[in-house]
Amino acid sequence: MEKIKKMPQIKKNLIKCFSMEITVLCKVVDNFGDIGVVFRLCRALSELKKNLEIRLVVSNLDSFAKISKGIDSTKTFQEFRGWKVFDWNDNALCKKEFSKNPPEFILECFQCGRPEWLEELLFSQQFNLNVLQAIPGDRIENIPK
């Protein structure tokens, strides 16, 4: 965290450009290493930008609860340190919450990938790029469908 406080001005300006909401994904692979780093990252981001909304999606709340006394591993949603903490595995809850308020900025920590429910939300609207071609605008209406 000390290194983050001493970031050059350029990096601090990047923090200012962040949206007001960041969704942080953490798939716990080892017991405490990855969730420990993600916890410190979220804490540092909160300190850098006071009104930042952090939504932390964690695959193993038991591990998180062991390193932080404020986490209840039995709750699939909770508020902690001003963050919204979600259980990665509660598909219905997460899909409902993130459908109402889609993520603006997503951090996939340690290349964890995205949960299936988030993939569905992000890629639910698709269009076929094969149809888009360099055709003059006045001829587009004449293209057969």
Where are the regions a protein language model picked out?
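Cationic, amphipathic, low-complexity segments that mediate targeting or membrane/lipid association
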Residues: 2-11
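Residue-level detector of alpha-helix boundary/anchor positions
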Residues: 2-3, 18, 99
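Extreme N-terminal starter segment of soluble prokaryotic enzymes
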Residues: 19-23
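Active-site and donor-binding regions of nucleotide-sugar-utilizing enzymes
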Residues: 25-49, 55-145
